[in-house]
Structures are given as C-alpha cells and as structure tokens.
C-alpha cells in the first residue's frame, strides 16, 4: 500500500460526509495507517461513533470551523458547492479532492485492483468475492458498500497487493479508478439525473473497459444486451459468464425451499465443480458466477472458491432476515431500481409464505420520475403493496412526482396498493393485516428498514 499522493503522513485529512459508507471506509483505512483524521456529517450514527472510537475527530453539522486544521479535504458527490466547509477550503486554498479521485489515487498503490461495476449487485458481488479472497488467503484490502460480518464492517486493510472495491458509475466516478480486473455485472438505465440516456451510460462503461490494462481482465455478464454492445472495446483478456452462454456457465440449476440456488459451474462444456448458494434468487446465481470468474482469473483454487461462495450468507440490507413475530417473517432489501425490485420479489415469491406484503419507499424524486413506467410494472409478484413517501436523499421535492402518483398507477393496473405518509401508520396497518405465515418485505435504499424493525420490536 502506498500513500505517495498524500506526500506526508503528518497531514491532517478531513472528510465531508464521513458517515457515508464509502467515505467512512476510506477514513478507516487512513486511521489504520496512523493518519490524523477528522470528518463532519449531518447526523451521528453507529458509523461515526465507530470512527470516533478509532481516533477520528467527528463534527456533527457542517461548519467552516471544522476544517481549521485540515491539510486535505475529501468530499462526496452529494456535497453541494455551497457547503460552508467547501467554501472555507477554497478561501483558505486548502486542497480539495472528491471521493472518487481519492479512491483512485489509493488504488495506484496496489497491483491487483478488482473494481466491481454494474447498475445492480455491486455490494453483494464485492462481498461474495471478499469471502472467496479471504478463504484463498490472499490478504486483500476490501472496501464494500455495506456491512459484511466476516470483516466486521465495510472495510478491511490487508498487506497484499490485492484491493477489492465497488466501482460506482454515478457521475462517472469509476472512470477515476485503476482496475486490473474490471467487472461489469449489468448495465441498466439509472442515475438519469446525471446521464442523458442509456446510450450515455453505456458510453461511460465503454470508457471503464478501456481503463483495464492489456494483461488485465474484463469479467462481464455476456447475456446482457447492453454489455454485448460495448464488450468489443476491450483491449485485455475477456471472461464472460451466463446461464445459457459465456465462458463460465451455470448448469443444472435447482432452488431450495428458501430460493437459494445450487448449480454446476461449467467451462467449455466441462463441469468444473458444483456450488450451493446461501443467498436467494437467480440474480445471486449471476453474482456468484462473476465472483467465480474473478477467482479463476486470479488463480485461486477451486476449493477456496467453493468454500468462499458457500460461506456467504449475504450482507446487511440485502435480502436480510430481520426476524419473525407471531410466525410472520420480516425481510429487508436495499432494492431501489425496478430491475432490482423485480429480482427481489422473484426471490421472495420462492420463499415460504402465505401472503407477501411489499413495503416500498421510492428513492429520490429524479429516479421515481425518470423510471416511473418501469416502477408501475415491477411489483406484480407482491400480493399487496404498501408505499411510503419518496426518500429525498440529496434532492428537493419539486412537486412534480410523488408516491401517491405511483400508487394511483398501481391501483389502475388492478394491484392492491395503499399509500401512507408515516412509518407508524404502516406499522399499524401491518399489525392489523399481516397474518400467520405471511412475509413482510421492506424495500428501498432509504430508511424503510425502520418499519420492519418497529414491527419486530413491538
């Protein structure tokens, strides 16, 4: 690991938005290497408390006074230009670096950077691969967009040349990375507040492919038509995977009673080995194939790949079993794009249940608006839909779109759908209507998981 771009270990580095999952991971890597770290966030959280315990100075709220001792400031794409700490840094000529630039510079210190991109499945695949790499004893540094039990958080600092990270396409952040193995899980229309259209998104992924060196590897889902159209841009080794085609395929797929797949891994019509997943759905078969391809490209042993895949039981907020109450199961999932919701509901439909309640909180006004038609068609596997208000995240409500409008369209299609504006009202509705053997699935990237926790903790 090298921190040459920072120049001086005595420097004080300040993170604006330090409570974010990626920012906190970067801060933790630097704390491990004895840098002086501070950071600000709008709210205290278990993440900020953990960083404080590790030696970071944490400020709640954004104020210009927070950066008085900083030599370098790292900020996220979600931080507005009128943030008082950004303004103060510019006035004082303190160096500013966005999160993607910082992570990209950090990656320069590693030889085997594995960057996992795609519209869906990045966190799960990064986590699954992390299990494989740890079983193979390659001692990787890991930065993942969720909490992973095997590393007790979202970051692990290793001593080898292996660095495993997610590569997010939002605002073309992943184009600042240095992948030796670049992974594309899928390409779908998303982040249309930044990208003009799907072709614009595909163009960004095409540029990502060109970042991979000639002796490196592109691992890609070969049955995705959007990937097929850009894979020719690769000037490196290419490994494709899929169910019915690709260099590495899944054959003889069977699902257990909880929708977890087991299958044979096949190359050139020859069986390599079999694996049994402990995460549900077809989408996780594809995620596991990507992890298997990376393991094979990295010369990991079949035994370690199998054990790593089979030891993975998921990450927090990815089809996470929250608990059972009165024989009613509560599961939470981070799905916030129509494609993800369809995949999650498909897995839930295979899960043991009588009636399936889907409690959905749309994430951002821009996504709800630009993908509105797709949102009206992705809930068909739910027996009943409960909609919360849109989670704004980095956006402001312009009054153009609302959950009520989505609910109206779903009801027009003949689906049973109810809108609520308060979590307490959702909880009370579930208390009255969920019965023995039912399944409650909370879905969304905001704070809808709290509804499930409220229900479980009655």
Swiss-Prot record:
Pathway: Cell wall biogenesis; peptidoglycan biosynthesis. Its EC number is 6.3.2.8. Pfam families: Mur_ligase (PF01225), Mur_ligase_C (PF02875), Mur_ligase_M (PF08245). GO terms for biological process: cell division; cell wall organization; peptidoglycan biosynthetic process; regulation of cell shape. ATP binds at residues 118-124. GO terms for molecular function: ATP binding; UDP-N-acetylmuramate-L-alanine ligase activity. Keywords: ATP-binding, Cell cycle, Cell division, Cell shape, Cell wall biogenesis/degradation, Cytoplasm, Ligase, Nucleotide-binding, Peptidoglycan synthesis. GO terms for cellular component: cytoplasm. It catalyses: UDP-N-acetyl-alpha-D-muramate + L-alanine + ATP = UDP-N-acetyl-alpha-D-muramoyl-L-alanine + ADP + phosphate + H(+). It is found in: Cytoplasm. It comes from the Bacteria. InterPro entries: Mur-like_cat_sf, Mur_ligase_C, Mur_ligase_C_dom_sf, Mur_ligase_cen, Mur_ligase_N, MurCDEF_pg_biosynth, UDP-N-AcMur_Ala_ligase_MurC. NCBIfam families: murC. Belongs to the MurCDEF family. PANTHER family: UDP-N-ACETYLMURAMATE--L-ALANINE LIGASE (PTHR43445:SF3), UDP-N-ACETYLMURAMATE--L-ALANINE LIGASE-RELATED (PTHR43445). Cell wall formation. This is UDP-N-acetylmuramate--L-alanine ligase. It comes from Clostridium botulinum (strain Langeland / NCTC 10281 / Type F).
């Amino acid at each position: 690991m090298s921190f040459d771009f920072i120049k001086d270990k005595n420097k004080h580095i300040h993170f604006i938005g330090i409570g974010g999952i990626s920012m906190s991971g970067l801060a933790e890597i630097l704390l491990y290497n004895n840098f002086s770290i501070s950071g600000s966030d709008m709210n205290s959280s278990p993440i900020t408390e953990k960083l404080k315990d590790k030696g970071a100075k944490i400020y709640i709220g954004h104020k210009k006074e927070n950066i008085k001792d900083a030599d370098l400031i790292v900020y996220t794409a979600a931080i507005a230009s009128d943030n008082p700490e950004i303004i103060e840094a510019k006035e004082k000529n303190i160096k500013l670096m966005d999160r993607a630039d910082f992570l990209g510079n950090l990656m320069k210190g590693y030889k085997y950077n594995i960057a996992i991109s795609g519209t869906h499945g990045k966190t799960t695949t990064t986590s699954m691969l992390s299990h494989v790499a740890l079983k193979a004893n390659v001692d990787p540094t890991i930065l993942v967009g969720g909490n992973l039990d095997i590393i007790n958080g979202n970051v692990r600092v290793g001593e080898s040349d292996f660095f495993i990270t997610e590569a997010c396409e939002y605002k073309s952040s992943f184009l600042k990375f240095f992948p030796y193995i670049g992974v594309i899980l899928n390409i779908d229309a998303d982040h249309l507040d930044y990208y003009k259209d799907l072709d614009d998104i595909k163009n960004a992924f095409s540029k990502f492919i060109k970042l991979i060196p000639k002796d490196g590897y592109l691992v890609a889902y070969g049955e995705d038509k959007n990937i097929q159209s850009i894979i020719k841009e690769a000037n490196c080794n290419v490994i494709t995977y899929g169910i019915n085609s690709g260099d590495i395929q899944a054959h003889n797929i069977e699902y257990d009673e909880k929708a977890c797949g087991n299958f044979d891994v096949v190359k050139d019509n020859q069986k390599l080995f079999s694996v049994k997943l402990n995460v549900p759905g077809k989408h996780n078969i594809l995620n596991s194939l990507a992890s298997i391809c990376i393991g094979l490209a990295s010369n990991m042993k079949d035994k370690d790949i199998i054990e790593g895949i089979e030891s993975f039981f998921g990450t927090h907020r990815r089809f996470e079993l929250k608990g059972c109450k009165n024989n009613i199961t509560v599961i939470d999932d981070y799905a916030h794009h129509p494609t993800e919701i369809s995949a999650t509901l498909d897995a839930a439909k295979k899960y043991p249940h009588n009636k399936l309640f889907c409690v959905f909180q749309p994430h951002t006004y821009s996504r709800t608006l630009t993908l509105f038609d797709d949102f009206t068609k992705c809930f068909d596997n739910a027996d009943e839909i409960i909609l919360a208000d849109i989670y704004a995240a980095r956006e402001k409500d312009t009054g153009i779109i609302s959950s009520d409008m989505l609910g109206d369209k779903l009801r027009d299609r003949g689906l049973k759908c109810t809108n609520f504006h308060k979590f307490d009202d959702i909880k009370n509705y579930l208390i009255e209507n969920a019965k023995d053997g039912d399944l409650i699935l909370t879905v969304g990237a905001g704070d809808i998981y709290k509804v499930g926790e409220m229900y479980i903790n009655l």
